[in-house]
Amino acid sequence: MVATVKRTIRIKTQQHILPEVPPVENFPVRQWSIEIVLLDDEGKEIPATIFDKVIYHLHPTFANPNRTFTDPPFRIEEQGWGGFPLDISVFLLEKAGERKIPHDLNFLQESYEVEHVIQIPLNKPLLTEELAKSGSTEETTANTGTIGKRRTTTNTTAEPKAKRAKTGSASTVKGSVDLEKLAFGLTKLNEDDLVGVVQMVTDNKTPEMNVTNNVEEGEFIIDLYSLPEGLLKSLWDYVKKNTE
């Protein structure tokens, strides 16, 4: 198994009203921006040079809704009258993988920050070199219930007998996602793609989510109905992409 380390990225959002622009449907038009930074081992912001590019998947009403940026801080600026949930795809250097992060663009505050912990492989020389700028590149010690025991297995940890994603959900729809179809799609993924599912769920785990990592049985059990709509949509997009 490939050794990994954890890093924390910070998504920074700012917005303000544009008083000179006429309102739309009685809502003021705002200028907003999002940028991404990395936190070092002291919690200080540094450029996120571990990423090759970042793609913001905006609301489809925007022209060219998938916006790509290749230079830190991967800042996007736009105007609009309403907030919306979006996905942000961050791509690690040397094609070491994509992480899709749900983000809520809202206008409750003029500025706010959200942090996400992601797992990063240590098998790419340039990526490891950039990782060293933010902290240790020693393999992360896994905690019970995290993806670490799947992706950072060492000689002191037994290899799981099999890697399976179990789903516990009724036949129902949440938001725009049919949970029954999602559950069926998960069963069609190969082992490598299932690792991506585990990564996405673990990176975005909250206390409200009912997720169990049964290491001894090699199972990662997900109650789909407990997942937020943004994450469910990301999982559905991932399943469709990897099963079509």
UniProtKB/Swiss-Prot annotation:
PANTHER family: YEATS DOMAIN. This is Transcription initiation factor TFIID subunit 14. The record marks 104 as: Acylated histone binding. Pfam families: BET, YEATS. Residues 133-169 are annotated as: Disordered. Residues 59-61, 81-83 are annotated as: Acylated histone binding. Changing residue 80 to A: Abolished binding to acylated histone H3. The 1.2 MDa TFIID complex is composed of TATA binding protein (TBP) and the 14 TBP-associated factors. One copy of each TAF1, TAF2, TAF3, TAF7, TAF8, TAF11, TAF13, two copies of each TAF4, TAF5, TAF6, TAF9, TAF10, TAF12, and three copies of TAF14. TFIIF is composed of three different subunits: TFG1/RAP74, TFG2/RAP30 and TAF14. Component of the SWI/SNF global transcription activator complex. It is found in: Nucleus. Its main location: nucleus. Functions as a component of the DNA-binding general transcription factor complex TFIID, the RNA polymerase II associated general transcription factor complex TFIIF, and the chromatin-remodeling complex SWI/SNF. Binding of TFIID to a promoter (with or without TATA element) is the initial step in preinitiation complex (PIC) formation. Belongs to the TAF14 family. It comes from Saccharomyces cerevisiae (strain ATCC 204508 / S288c). Residues 143-157 have a biased composition (Low complexity). GO terms for biological process: chromatin remodeling; DNA repair; DNA-templated transcription; positive regulation of transcription by RNA polymerase II; regulation of DNA-templated transcription; regulation of transcription by RNA polymerase II; RNA polymerase II preinitiation complex assembly; transcription by RNA polymerase II. The YEATS domain specifically recognizes and binds acylated histones (acetylated and crotonylated). Binds crotonylated lysine through a non-canonical pi-pi-pi stacking mechanism. InterPro entries: NET_dom, Sas5/TAF14, YEAST_sf, YEATS, YEATS_dom. The keyword Transferase does not apply. GO terms for molecular function: DNA binding; histone binding; RNA polymerase II general transcription initiation factor activity. TAF14 is the only non-essential TAF. There is a cross-link at residue 181 (Glycyl lysine isopeptide (Lys-Gly) (interchain with G-Cter in ubiquitin)). One of its GO terms (cellular component) is SWI/SNF complex. Disulfide bonds: none annotated. Residues 1-134 form the YEATS domain.
